[in-house]
Amino acid sequence: MNDIRFKWDERKNRENKRKHKVSFEEAHTVFLDENAIRYFDPDHSQDEDRFIMLGMSFTLRVLVVCHCYRREQGHPLEAGVSVVQEQ
């Protein structure tokens, strides 16, 4: 998974940093995590196939990265810190 090239909209990157405190630059590093897990997201794949990646970033944060692929490039759609809630 580490040979994927990424492209993103800078406005969306700023919005994601404001909303989730995660930049797409950091989110991209999750794809270098050999233990990352990728899931197909059928609930959000009406117009294009979308995926959810769970992995560790270079800052050692566990991130959830929602993304798709267009013209053989990855496009992050949203990224945030994974939060486990204890009951």
Residue ranges and their predicted role:
Residues M1-Q87:
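Ribonuclease/tRNase effector modules and their secretory precursors
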